[in-house]
C-alpha cells in the first residue's frame, strides 16, 4: 500500500496514526515511554530522546539511568521522570574488593556478551538492578535502549539482560547508539524479535552489516544499492525494522521500504539522533494504538505498514524541525534548538488533530 507513494501522500497517510486527545482518555494513554541509558559522562543523549518523545506527544516520559547521571538529567527538566537504577563498576554500593573490581573492568567484550558466563556480573544485576528496572517496564508501552549507555562492563551486561527482559514482556523496543554496538558484536541479541527497531547511522550500519557478512561501502550513494543492503540486513535480522539514517532516511522491514527525502539541517550535531529516536518511540506507540482501535478509529493499514509509516512520520517531524532550527541558528545550531521547533514542525505537517475522531 505504501510503495511508490510520494512524500506528500505518505505525510497525508500518516495523519491517521496521530492519536487524538479525547476527553475520555486518561493520563498515559497517549504513551508511556522509557529511555534506558545515561551515565556519568553522557547525560544529554537520554535527555534528548525522552524530551523529544514528550514534545511530540507522549503523556509520560521516563529515563532509567546510572546513578551518577540521575541528578544531572533531573536538572535539565522537571517534566521527565528519572530513575537512577543502573550501576557501573565505580558504584560504591557494589561492595566488591579491589581484585574483583579490577578483573571485571578488564573483562574482554566477548565474555560480557555471553549470556550467563559471568556469575559476579549476573548476581549484581539480578539483586541490585533488574528488579527495579522490571518493575517499571511492567508499566511501559515502548522502550528505547542505548542513548548514553557507555561501555562499562556492568552497564553493557545490564543492557543485554534488560533487552532479554523486554522480549519476555513482549514490548516494542528501539535500539540506538551504544546498544547498536552490542548488535554489531552479537546480532542474535535482537534478531528475530518482531517488535524491534534499530536506528543505525552510516558507521553503525556498516558494523552491523559486517557482522552479518554483508559488504557495505561507506562511499556508496546509489539509491538502489543502499535499499538492497538495508533489505538484506533487515532479513538477516529476522525482518525487523531497520531505520538507516543518512542524507535520506531509509526505513526498511524485509522487502518493504520507505525513503524520507524531506530537507533537514545542513549541520550534524550530537544529539539529533537521540531526538529522532524519541520521536519514533511516540509515533510507533501511536501506530500500535491505531491498530488496537484505541480511539474507535478505522484501520486501513496492517501492523507492518503502520509501524513503517510511524517511523516516516517521526523522521519528517525531526527533519522539518532541524531545518527550521538551522535556518535560524546556522552554524551555531544545537540539538536543543531543534527541540524548540518540534511542536511547530508537528502541527505544520499533521495539523493539531486534538479532537479528531475520523481518519481524515
From Swiss-Prot:
(6S)-NADPHX binds at residues 148, 201-207, 274. The keyword Phosphoprotein applies. Its EC number is 4.2.1.93. Catalyzes the dehydration of the S-form of NAD(P)HX at the expense of ATP, which is converted to ADP. Together with NAD(P)HX epimerase, which catalyzes the epimerization of the S- and R-forms, the enzyme allows the repair of both epimers of NAD(P)HX, a damaged form of NAD(P)H that is a result of enzymatic or heat-dependent hydration. HAMAP family: NADHX_dehydratase (MF_01965). Belongs to the NnrD/CARKD family. It comes from the Eukaryota. Its cofactor is Mg(2+). Keywords: ATP-binding, Cytoplasm, Lyase, NAD, NADP, Nucleotide-binding, Phosphoprotein. It catalyses: (6S)-NADHX + ATP = ADP + phosphate + NADH + H(+); (6S)-NADPHX + ATP = ADP + phosphate + NADPH + H(+). One of its GO terms (biological process) is nicotinamide nucleotide metabolic process. Residues 10-349 form the YjeF C-terminal domain. One of its GO terms (cellular component) is cytoplasm. ATP binds at residues 245-249, 264-273. This is ATP-dependent (S)-NAD(P)H-hydrate dehydratase. It is found in: Cytoplasm. One of its GO terms (molecular function) is ATP binding.
Amino acid at each position: 500500500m505504501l510503495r511508490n507513494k510520494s512524500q506528500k501522500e505518505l505525510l497525508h497517510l500518516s495523519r491517521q496514526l496521530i492519536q487524538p486527545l479525547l476527553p475520555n482518555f486518561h493520563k498515559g494513554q497517549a504513551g508511556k515511554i522509557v529511555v534506558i541509558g545515561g551515565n556519568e559522562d553522557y547525560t544529554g543523549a537520554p535527555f534528548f530522546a525522552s524530551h523529544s518523545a514528550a514534545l511530540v506527544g507522549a503523556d509520560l516520559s521516563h529515563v532509567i539511568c546510572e546513578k551518577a547521571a540521575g541528578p544531572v538529567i533531573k536538572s535539565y527538566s522537571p517534566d521527565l521522570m528519572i530513575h537512577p537504577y543502573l550501576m557501573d563498576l565505580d558504584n560504591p554500593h557494589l561492595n566488591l574488593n579491589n581484585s574483583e573490581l579490577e578483573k571485571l573492568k578488564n573483562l574482554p567484550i566477548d565474555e560480557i556478551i555471553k549470556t550467563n558466563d559471568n556469575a559476579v556480573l549476573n548476581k549484581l544485576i539480578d539483586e541490585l538492578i533488574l528488579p527495579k528496572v522490571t518493575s517499571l517496564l511492567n508499566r511501559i508501552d515502548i522502550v528505547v535502549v542505548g542513548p548514553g549507555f557507555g561501555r562499562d562492563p556492568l552497564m553493557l551486561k545490564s543492557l543485554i539482560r534488560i533487552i532479554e527482559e523486554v522480549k519476555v514482556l513482549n514490548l516494542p523496543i528501539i535500539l540506538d547508539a551504544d546498544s547498536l554496538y552490542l548488535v554489531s558484536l552479537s546480532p542474535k541479541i535482537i534478531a528475530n524479535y518482531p517488535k524491534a527497531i534499530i536506528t543505525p547511522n552510516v558507521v553503525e550500519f556498516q558494523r552491523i552489516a559486517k557482522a552479518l557478512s554483508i559488504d557495505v561501502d561507506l562511499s556508496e550513494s546509489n539509491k538502489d544499492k543502499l535499499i538492497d543492503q538495508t533489505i538484506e540486513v533487515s532479513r538477516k535480522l529476522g525482518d525487523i525494522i531497520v531505520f538507516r539514517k543518512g542524507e535520506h532516511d531509509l526505513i526498511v522491514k524485509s522487502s518493504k521500504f520507505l525513503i524520507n527525502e524531506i530537507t533537514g539541517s545542513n549541520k550534524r550535531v550530537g544529539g539529533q539522533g537521540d531526538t529522532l529516536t524519541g520521536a519514533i518511540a511516540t509515533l510507533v506507540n501511536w501506530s500500535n494504538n491505531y491498530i488496537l482501535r484505541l480511539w474507535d478509529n478505522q484501520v486501513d493499514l496492517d501492523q507492518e505498514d503502520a509501524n513503517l509509516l510511524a517511523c516516516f512520520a517521526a523522521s519528517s517531524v525531526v527533519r522539518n524541525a532541524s531545518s527550521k532550527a538551522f535556518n535560524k541558528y546556522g552554524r551555531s545550531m544545537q540539538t536543543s534548538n531543534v527541540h524548540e521547533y518540534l511542536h511547530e514542525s508537528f502541527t505544520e505537517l499533521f495539523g493539531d488533530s486534538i479532537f479528531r475522531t475520523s481518519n481524515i
